[in-house]
């Protein structure tokens, strides 16, 4: 599980370099803000396109093989990127990363996690996966940013950082091949159903319900990206302090995800997801009406902590619904691909919505509307999780 968690973190380091190294990336490639955003957009579009096919492949190949190939191929592309090629080549690399990261890794990672634990411990399995991802994300980010600063913080230093990332990918790919179990009897059965799996999965109401849960929860995850500017622009906090709050919430991820997994196995997955949506609704509704006065700063920070815990708890358990809804193990990858293609569409529309609202309604109003929309979507997620509880646990959907 430690290797799965680390793999699930490391694989996203290269495509999302701009999150930690925004200006160094622009300087190295000589690109504008729009061009920088296009790099991530190309990766996102390729990822969405490859979720279903990647999941289908995950049902036909050993997760160990796919995870290893994903890490190694992504790392090799990273070595090319460390030379800072022309912008068209950089776009091509990001498009290929969409295939090597999402198409190869995601479905295999979810399937390997499901196979790792028995049915009654699925909450723990996915909770520990997300906890491992959160812990390694925070630790690696802190370490590598410090190394970057120590190397001089310039373009040559950034090239070395990219090479370190690439080396880490390749090395972890080799370790994953040696450590991850070669497979379970379920996956090694000879029964295969071809592309008809997509039709079978599409007929399962549970798949659409889980996709709704993931999508609405992921909208809340996108809402968390706006906590930093919300704190600085609405409450007048300094950028440094607001950024520190944002960085601090990252360390909540491993604790919240692991705890949610343990609780979910005790009280039920869908019950835990539903409770999380109740918390998210109350929290984001609070953001939507909270005036930006100095006397309410402590309440605002407390609400950020509460919302972050609920968001990270959800990320730790919502794919455990695959077992609770009795999705056939042979279709885990295909179902994951379809769910992810729908569930992660907020990557496309949430930043556009946020930008439009903040530009159209400057000041607190834009944030209040944005957070209000997320509160409303949390109700949709709550209804989906309650429907799963009413139908999915008693019978295979």
Residue ranges and their predicted role:
Residues 123-148, 340-351:
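Glycine-rich segments within core transmembrane alpha-helices of 12-TM secondary carriers
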Residues 18-22, 141, 204-257, 315, ...:
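Extracytoplasmic gate region of multi-pass secondary transporters
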Residues 60-71, 265-278:
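Cytoplasmic membrane-interface "Motif A"-like loop-to-helix N-cap segments
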Residues 72-86, 279-294:
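C-terminal ends and interior cores of transmembrane alpha-helices
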Residues 93-132:
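Cytoplasmic helix-loop-helix junction between adjacent transmembrane helices
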């Amino acid at each position: 599980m430690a290797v799965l968690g680390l793999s699930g973190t490391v694989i996203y380091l290269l495509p999302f370099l701009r999150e930690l190294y925004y200006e160094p990336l622009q300087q190295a490639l000589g690109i504008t803000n729009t061009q920088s955003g296009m790099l991530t957009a190309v990766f996102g579009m390729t990822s969405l396109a490859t979720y279903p096919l990647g999941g289908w492949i995950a049902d036909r190949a050993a997760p160990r093989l796919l995870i290893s190939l994903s890490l190694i191929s992504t790392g090799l592309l990273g070595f090319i990127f460390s030379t800072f090629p022309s912008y068209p080549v950089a776009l091509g690399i990001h498009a290929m990363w969409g295939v090597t990261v999402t198409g190869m890794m995601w479905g295999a990672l979810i399937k390997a996690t499901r196979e790792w634990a028995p049915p009654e411990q699925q909450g723990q399995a996915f909770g520990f996966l997300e906890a491992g991802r959160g812990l390694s994300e925070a630790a690696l980010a802190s370490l590598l940013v410090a190394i970057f600063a120590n190397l001089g913080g310039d373009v040559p230093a950034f090239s070395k950082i990219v090479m370190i990332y690439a080396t880490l990918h390749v090395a972890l790919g080799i370790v994953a091949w040696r450590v991850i179990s070669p497979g379970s009897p379920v996956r090694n059965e000879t029964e295969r159903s071809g592309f008809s799996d997509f039709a079978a999965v599409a007929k399962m109401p549970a798949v659409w319900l889980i996709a709704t849960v993931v999508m609405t929860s992921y909208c809340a995850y996108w809402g968390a990206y706006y906590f930093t500017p919300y704190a600085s622009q609405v409450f007048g906090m300094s950028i440094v302090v607001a950024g520190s709050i944002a960085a601090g919430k990252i360390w909540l991820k491993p604790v919240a995800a692991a705890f949610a997994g343990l609780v979910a196995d005790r009280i039920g997955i869908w019950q835990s997801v539903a409770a999380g949506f109740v918390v998210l609704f109350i929290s984001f509704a609070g953001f939507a009406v909270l005036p930006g006065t100095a006397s309410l700063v402590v309440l605002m920070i407390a609400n950020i902590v509460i919302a972050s815990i609920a968001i990270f708890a959800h990320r730790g358990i919502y794919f455990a619904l695959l077992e609770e809804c009795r999705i056939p193990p042979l279709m885990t990858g295909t179902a994951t691909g379809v769910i992810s293609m729908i569930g992660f569409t907020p990557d496309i529309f949430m930043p556009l919505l946020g930008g439009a609202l903040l530009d159209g309604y400057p000041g607190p109003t834009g944030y209040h509307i944005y957070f209000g929309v997320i509160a409303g979507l949390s109700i949709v997620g709550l209804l989906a999780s309650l429907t799963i509880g009413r139908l999915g646990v008693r019978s295979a959907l």
